[in-house]
Amino acid sequence: MGMKRKKISIIGAGFTGATTAFILAQKELGDIVLVDIPQLENPTKGKALDMLESSPVLGFDANIIGTSDYADTADSDVVVITAGIARKPGMSRDDLVTTNQGIMKAVTKEVVKYSPNCFIIVLTNPVDAMTYTVFKESGFPKNRVIGQSGVLDTARFRTFVAQELNLSVKDITGFVLGGHGDDMVPLVRYSYAGGIPLETLIPKERLDAIVERTRKGGGEIVNLLGNGSAYYAPAASLAEMVEAIVKDQRRVLPAIAYLEGEYGYEGIYLGVPTILGGNGIEKVIELELTEEEKAALAKSVESVKNVMKVLQ
């Protein structure tokens, strides 16, 4: 048997899906299959071809195709799900639940049929509940179904901190726990600039303001765009997770993982620090939390559970 490139399928060829495909191709992480509904097959093929035609200039080797036929995704190593309706201004993530749950179930059936051994990364909002839906529908083990929110939330937090301190974002590390939404819990105690705790560098009221802006980061962009939601940073975050799995990097990354007792919670998907590598979620890292952080996390869990009550 000859060596084969990895195969990564992206379900949903909207702004986020297409941007993810473009980043993955440039990183040469594998061949890319971009999938959308039959009515959008031609535009999807057009996007894929346009990206492919950039490869001689950007200097990457990757085959990129657009399709509406899941047979083209057969034997994918990683499948990224971005399909679903997007949030409009004034709409909460929860309004999306029922529509997107139906989409998740339909997509998951096809994914499992053609790629029974793949890893699935879910981006569709409300992401904690949608990841749970995909997990249940797929019958996959918990390590192979992962949600993306923490990498993005942490990226926003790190961006704002770097701006505040006028430092390189590369030197800023941070962690965000909990649900993806207004109840996320940025763990300032575990956040550093070049190994120096942020609390020693930024006054408390400024840090609180950064935390607040991070919580509302998605909404800030929704309001500015006026139509649609963020896609560059979400796509970059998905690509980082795909890379960790495909290259077996064993990265410490926040991800939405299925909890079985960690942090005192059972049977839900929640954003936690994980080790992400060739086996997907290889470990959930349990951090010591203060009473205040535990209370904030409990509130976050409550929000996730409230959304899950809406699930059919």
UniProtKB/Swiss-Prot annotation:
Binding site for substrate: 87, 93, 125, 156
EC numbers on record: 1.1.1.37
Entry-linked PANTHER family: L-2-HYDROXYCARBOXYLATE DEHYDROGENASE (NAD(P)(+)), L-LACTATE DEHYDROGENASE
Biological process terms in GO annotation: lactate metabolic process; tricarboxylic acid cycle
Organism: Anoxybacillus flavithermus (strain DSM 21510 / WK1)
Alphabetical UniProt keywords: NAD, Oxidoreductase, Phosphoprotein, Tricarboxylic acid cycle
Source organism, top-level taxon: Bacteria
Record-given protein name: Malate dehydrogenase
